[in-house]
C-alpha cells in the first residue's frame, strides 16, 4: 500500500478456529505491527504467544484478559481502543423498552468466550431489567446455527425482544441475523450501526470509523518508533444512536417524535 507500507490481512468472520489459523499465519510473516479488530482475533494472537507490537480496536476487557496492565500505562507490547463499556448493557435494555414498550421478556444473545466480557454486560442488563419490569433470559451461543435456534425459539413468546451483545460472529453474520429477527417479528437492539444498515431496528454503540481511525494512528506511531507500552488504551466517550424507521413500521411500532429527535440518524 503506497510505497513504504505492505498490509497483509486474514478474515475469520468471528470463527474461533479460523481466527487461530489467521493468527498463526500473520505471526509467521513477522510484520512490524499486528492489528486485531475483535475480541476473538486479539485472544487468538495472545494464545499464539505473539511478542510482535499489537494494536486492537474492539476489545471489551483488555485488563481482564491481561492484554494490558492499565489503560493509562499498558506496560506491554499491546495497546489500542476499547469500543464498549459494561454500562451499555443497561442502556440497550432501556432503549429497547422505550422503542417497544410492550416488551416483557428479553433474550440476550451473547458469546460466552471470556474475551467478550459478557458477564459485565449481563450484570448491567439484569439490574436495569429488574427496574423496568422486564425478564432477561441469557441465551449463550457457540455458532451461527445456535443463534438462529435461539431467535426462532422466541418468536412464539408473548411480548419478547432481543439484545445482541458485542460479538464478532453476529457482526459477520449480521445480514442473516437481522433477516431472521425480522421474519420472527422481534424487536431487537444491536451494538453497532452495521446491523441497522441491513435492516436491524435500532443500535447504540461506537462509531467504527472513529475507532479505526484512532487505531490507525497508533499503528502509524508504532511504525515510527513509539512503544505500545507507552500509548494509553483509549476508552469510548461518544456513542451513536441509530433507528431504522422502516423496520419499526414493519413491526407496527409507533415511535414518539421525542425519541426520533434523540437519534443521531433515522434510516427511512
Predicted regions and their residues:
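Short hydrophobic alpha-helices and adjacent helix-cap/hinge residues
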Residues: 1-268
Amino acid at each position: 500500500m503506497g510505497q513504504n507500507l505492505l498490509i497483509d490481512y486474514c478474515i475469520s468472520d468471528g470463527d474461533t478456529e479460523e481466527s487461530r489459523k489467521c493468527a498463526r499465519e500473520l505471526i509467521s510473516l513477522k510484520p512490524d505491527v499486528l492489528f486485531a479488530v475483535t475480541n476473538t482475533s486479539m485472544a487468538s494472537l495472545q494464545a499464539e504467544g505473539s511478542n510482535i507490537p499489537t494494536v486492537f480496536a474492539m476489545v471489551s476487557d483488555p485488563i481482564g484478559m491481561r492484554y494490558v496492565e492499565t489503560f493509562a500505562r499498558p506496560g506491554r507490547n499491546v495497546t489500542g481502543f476499547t469500543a464498549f463499556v459494561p454500562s451499555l448493557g443497561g442502556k440497550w435494555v432501556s432503549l429497547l423498552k422505550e422503542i417497544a414498550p410492550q416488551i416483557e421478556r428479553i433474550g440476550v444473545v451473547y458469546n460466552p468466550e471470556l474475551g467478550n466480557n459478557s458477564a459485565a454486560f449481563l450484570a448491567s442488563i439484569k439490574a436495569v431489567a429488574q427496574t423496568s419490569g422486564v425478564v432477561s433470559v441469557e441465551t449463550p451461543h457457540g455458532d451461527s446455527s445456535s443463534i438462529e435456534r435461539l431467535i426462532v425459539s422466541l418468536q412464539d413468546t408473548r411480548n419478547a425482544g432481543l439484545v445482541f451483545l458485542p460479538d464478532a460472529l453476529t457482526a459477520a453474520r449480521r445480514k442473516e441475523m437481522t433477516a431472521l429477527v425480522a421474519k420472527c417479528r422481534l424487536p431487537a437492539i444491536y451494538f453497532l450501526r452495521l446491523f441497522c444498515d441491513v435492516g436491524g431496528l435500532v443500535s447504540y454503540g461506537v462509531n467504527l470509523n472513529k475507532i479505526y481511525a484512532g487505531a490507525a494512528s497508533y499503528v502509524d506511531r508504532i511504525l515510527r518508533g513509539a512503544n505500545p507500552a507507552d500509548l494509553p488504551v483509549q476508552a469510548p466517550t461518544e456513542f451513536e444512536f441509530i433507528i431504522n424507521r422502516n423496520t419499526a413500521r414493519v413491526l407496527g411500532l409507533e415511535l414518539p417524535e421525542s425519541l426520533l429527535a434523540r437519534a443521531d440518524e433515522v434510516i427511512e
